[in-house]
Amino acid sequence: MNRYKNGKIFSLFLMCGILGACDKFEAIPLEYKSTPLEEAQEEVLNTIDPAWELELMETNGYVMAFKDKKYDKLFTRTLGWNGGDGVLTTLLPDGNAFWSFNDSFYGVVEGETRARKDCSFPRNSIMVQTPGDEEENLVWLADFVQTTTPEAPRYYQARTHIRHPKASLSDDKIQEGEIDQDWLYWAGDATVCNNKLQVLWNGVDNTNPDALMRHEGICLATYSLEGTPGDDNYMKLISADHHFNDVDIYGYGSTLWEDEDGHIYLYGSYNNYDMIVARTARHDLTSPWEYYVGDEQGNFSWQNTYPTEEEVKRSRIQETDCSMPWVFKKGDTYYMLAQAKWFGREMYIFRSDKPYGPFVDCKRLFGFSDFLDKLGDQTYQNLYMINLHPHLSRNGEL
């Protein structure tokens, strides 16, 4: 599996197909607004500012999907970060946006051919975007090996942002620019509490060549938001609790939803395609967690103990196999956006009357092309980690 293909950032407009609420696993029939389809599509097209550089990708009834070519260009880079996966974002109180990345390329790319030269491969990295969508709005918070001498080795290469305590490389090797490969962290979701950024980092064990990328444990890192980007204190790592949740193997908090009921809902998965959920006691990731678990009769309840595998097998919260769930709310209804299984090239949308499901009435929202807008071979292998960035919305779109 080639996990290092560059992804795209898509802008998805939800037009006038309004989804209703649901009760348990019985979905109430949908009632659509009477706006004629062509009129509704034209209305959306008329709201698009040409400066956004949106390119129509697919029309699916009242849903229109666009490629965001402006963000494609923004992340088509020749120096420093020039590709990666993960790519989660969190809106900060000052209007800036926190970006986390997993496996990334740092170094130099030839501008005309897009060929990578000498690049390093840090396993996680972070960035802050100030309001705006220009190059100067991207403040990269990487620990660069050296940025002064283009002819010298490791020019604009970077170190991994946060290391796993079990990683085996010596400090001298890290200073030289070497990257840990045995134990590492990949980003989970993040939130703000008491004007500090809380980020979940999922532990990854690569020590067994027959079972690579095994999830083990969660680290909770806390960052300062004092000052402005570029200040010494802004995004300074205050603490990293490497033993925050040593027993986690299902990635609770890979994505999250902060609800008005006072809880943070933390979504994970069993067997990649069974979505499961936990929640915090308060809007604070350090508050106690409880897990939503189904019994043998199919009745769900919240429990304080981490679920066993048998319990998790009974605790799926959605009706159709999918991956990487993103929950949001519109009106009185919660929606879950997720990717079809087996690296599927379709996106699904579900609905529920609760942030913990059940999420039902699965519908195909849109599909991805089999080709990328790039030089050379435009086909690609696996499509994964399709993430929702609600604060990038310009006009109410997803």
What are the residue ranges of the model-derived segments?
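Beta-rich carbohydrate-recognition and catalytic domains
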Residues: 25, 29-32, 36-80, 92-183, ...
